[in-house]
Amino acid sequence: FVAGAGFLTMAAVMYGIRVPHIEPGATGNPARNLLEGLDYIRTNFLFIFLIGMTFFNSFFGMAYVSLMPVIAKDALSLGPGAYGILLSAGGVGSLLVTVVFGFAGNPQYKGLLIIGGAVLFGISLVAFGLTAELIGSYGLAIALLFIMGLFTSTYMISIQSSLQMMVPDSMRGRVMGFYGMTWSLMPLGAMPAAGLAVLIGAPFAIGVGGIAVAAFALLA
């Protein structure tokens, strides 16, 4: 109910926003426009890195969400109420960073924020999986999820704002379309994560996702 009310509120706010008319940058065949957007991304390594980073975040990094019920039940022995609090810790961290970015405007050193945030998110994800398995501390799990929320929002907000500012108006819709498509990969990432969890356990499967995100940020 609360989630539904939140979406209705957001819809009402969006409906009240008035923006000036902008001429469409793409006309004609949608498939051709899609290919043009892909070709534009391929011409710039920075755009490849930024879109690739969002892919790794959605497919590997955020796969931990699908494994959280297993962590809560088997590793932390939590009930529904404690599980809800655990999940909200990451949201609080993300919200805090979003508010800070809102007041900070356009921060410098976005490259450092992107790479550093992704690496630290990956490390935090590995730490969360390992400590849940080896220690089983509820308080520590909350703290690590809060930290993960801080870092993931740090680099994802930096990626989104960088794309918005760097891509010209004529291509922005198509490039941001690919950015949005990467978020749709999150449910697909749950499938290999679940398969890996069967083989090595959910905590270690979560750690593998964190390693993948950090490795891409450092090696790409």
Please provide the spans of the model-predicted regions.
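C-terminal membrane-cytosol helix-exit motif in multi-pass small-molecule transporters
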Residues: 6-23, 219-220
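Residues at helix-coil transition
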Residues: 17, 42-43, 61, 73
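Juxtamembrane intracellular "pre-TM" segments in multi-pass secondary transporters
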Residues: 19-52
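Alpha-helical transmembrane segments of multi-pass integral membrane proteins
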Residues: 47-54, 114, 140
